[in-house]
UniProtKB/Swiss-Prot annotation:
PANTHER family: UDP-3-O-ACYLGLUCOSAMINE N-ACYLTRANSFERASE, UDP-3-O-ACYLGLUCOSAMINE N-ACYLTRANSFERASE 1, MITOCHONDRIAL-RELATED. The lineage of its organism: Bacteria, Pseudomonadati, Pseudomonadota, Betaproteobacteria, Burkholderiales. It comes from Janthinobacterium sp. (strain Marseille). Keywords: Acyltransferase, Lipid A biosynthesis, Lipid biosynthesis, Lipid metabolism, Repeat, Transferase. GO terms for molecular function: N-acyltransferase activity. The keyword Lipid biosynthesis applies. The keyword Lipid metabolism applies. This is UDP-3-O-acylglucosamine N-acyltransferase. Pfam families: Hexapep_2, LpxD. Pathway: Bacterial outer membrane biogenesis; LPS lipid A biosynthesis.
Amino acid sequence: MSTRLGELVERLGGRLIGDADIEVVGIAPLNDADASHITFLSNPKFRGQAAQTHAAALILSAADDEVVAADYQGARIVTANPYAYFARAAQFFAALHAHIAPAGIHPSASVDPTAQIAASASIGPFVAVEAGAVIEDGCVIDAGCFIGRDARVGSGTHFYPRVTFLAGCRIGARGIIHSGAVIGADGFGFANEGGVYIKIPQTGAVRIGDDVEIGANTSIDRGALADTVLEDGVKLDNQIQIGHNCHIGAHTAMAGCVGVAGSAIIGKYCTFGGAAMVLGHLTIADHVHISSGSMVSRSIREPGQYTGFYPLAKNAEWEKSAVIVRNLATMREKIRELEKTIKSLGDKPE
């Protein structure tokens, strides 16, 4: 199925230079695109490839257009943010070619009579929906998912096969949860008495906002008393662990294998590189960016980019090293002052 280039620009905006009646079927990389595709240029270092692409149309910035236009023969869509435009165009074509799940409940699904399932929702094979659960308009619940007692799934949300969404958990509209994710398992809560661990019942839930995406095999634990919270627009990659009672601010994104210990509070618009670690009971400000593999061992009160990693050592040795490293800048200034003093003493006549 194809669409006119002019129709695409009418939907997504941008300034079209070229034939609006060109038919395109999708998006392809610069080197692979042919006359049925559009492509995009978001990094100036690929201007040479963009000029030689065989795509029907090229998405690019005004600055890149000034350089590429002389050599590229196809249509051009000029926009302030080519990468964001590419993302929206990709969504458009994905929807154009997507399989539409049929509304209704598969005969093999097990749905409690007290559960509320919207008529437009799609419930796949071998799905289990427990008592009091609510599944709103346009939801797609793929094969083998489990939705627990009194859980709520917001409109337009898609659960891929084998998602586990346990009792009392909530997710807002337009969410995506990928296969193998477990939402609402017990948090890791125990009291120690005489060397024996006593389990603390985890009676909170998980509360997730709108437009949240959760990757495959990611686990988000329910709160001990209050809820674990993910605000609107949070994006979690695969195999992430979010401990109980954490609060993740809106539009924060985490790459694969990030671990966040219980009761951490993370601000809005933060990013975490792969395998970053956050210790429990910390607070991280808005607009903080943590590099891959870093360990956050203290609260961060100011926005910015943070990086930190030490080799494994005995804890006492590690703490001493951390203090030394943290004070290196001050020590350097003191050494400079000492060098100046020594030099001035050496310059004095005997």
